[in-house]
């Protein structure tokens, strides 16, 4: 387990629901997808680069995802990742994306 975090740390994160509208191979050293995610009219679309290789690119398109949208951009090889899609590492080494269990409005905040 990680050390205890300050209670306000979680409150600083802006975690939103978005829908993957495009998933394609990223130009990175490790196998990675470049996903364009729609967060609704307030935030628009953002790009995330992630190692969700246990999914086919076409299977990611249309999927709702949970993402942190206020971490700033991160350089990943020649790609820029604007948001962090949250997921769980599974025993096979892949990552399973977290998603809401029902259809919620794009841009909804996770609380």
Language-model features: where?
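Phosphate-backbone binding interfaces of nucleic-acid-interacting proteins
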Residues: 1-111
């Amino acid at each position: 387990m990680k050390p205890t975090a300050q209670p306000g740390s979680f409150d600083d994160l802006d975690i939103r629901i978005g829908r993957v509208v495009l998933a394609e191979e990223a130009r990175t050293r490790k196998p990675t997808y470049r996903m364009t995610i729609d967060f609704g009219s307030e935030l628009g679309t953002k790009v995330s680069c992630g190692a969700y290789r246990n999914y086919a690119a076409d299977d990611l398109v249309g999927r709702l995802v949970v993402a942190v949208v206020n971490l700033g951009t991160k350089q990943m090889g020649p790609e820029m990742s604007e948001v962090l899609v949250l997921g769980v590492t599974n025993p096979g080494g892949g990552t399973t994306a977290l998603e809401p269990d029902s259809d919620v409005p794009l841009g909804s905040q996770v609380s």
